[in-house]
Amino acid sequence: MSEQVNNKVLITGANGFIGGALMRYYQNQGKDVIGVDLVGNGKDIIEGDISQPDTISSLLQGSDVVIHTAALVSNAMQDSDMWRVNVLATRNLIEAAKKHKVRRFVQISSIVAYGNSAEGELNESQPVLADGGSYVLTKLASEHVVLQAQANDAIEVVIVRPGDAYGPGSRPWVIVPLELIPKYQFMLPAKGEGFFRPIFIDDLIRGIYLAASHPDAAGEIFNLSCEDCRLRLP
């Protein structure tokens, strides 16, 4: 079945690594796309806080698809802030999207939904596990918020669980390692015994694009990552 034509696409967290790459991809495809982030650029990225109802309402007018990448990712943040941004703002956004007759809502979650201790190959049928910090807990809670919102068939939802996205400009998996490795300060996942589930940013963006556009993707959860691997010191 062919892809549906997305009219106006709204991307939250448009200045982020994933959000920015999505903006460029849609623009290169000639699509009508607009972004929102705490810092705008005066052009295609609007300055706004998605936790504020006025911001949400104005952005959603005429939008056909919302791709929600905005989130706090550091466990160093206060739990209350993580909950406000990752869960409450998601709830407000998708409820507003329903009111504005948005057709599809794509929630960018994370492979950590299966828990930090998950080993081996993962598939979407496996149970989730809240064994991490606030990031894991709020990502799982935001998934529940999104899944509940589709209960009345008022909006199509898709959840994407990316692995560790890397590529040019990636701070956690490119910039920071290149800074720390010469200093012998780079720590491997679980001291070299943990699983690393990488995905190149271009592959991830194509996957998200299909999640947002393919008719059969509605109501589904997708893991997007490459083959599992362990990173060990030689």
Model regions: which residues?
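Conserved Rossmann-fold NAD(P)-dependent oxidoreductase catalytic core, especially the SDR/UDP-sugar
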Residues: 92-134
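NAD(P)H-binding glycine-rich loop region in Rossmannoid oxidoreductase-like domains
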Residues: 42, 50-88, 96, 114-116
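Catalytic helix-loop patch of NAD(P)-dependent Rossmann-fold dehydrogenases
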Residues: 119-165, 186-189
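N-terminal Rossmann NAD(P)H-binding glycine-rich loop of SDR-like oxidoreductase domains
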Residues: 9-29
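Mid/C-terminal beta-alpha module of Rossmann-like enzyme folds, strongest
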Residues: 210, 214-234
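Short-chain dehydrogenase/reductase
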Residues: 81-87, 132-143, 164-167, 194-198, ...
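NAD(P)-dependent short-chain dehydrogenase/reductase
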Residues: 150-196, 201-202, 210
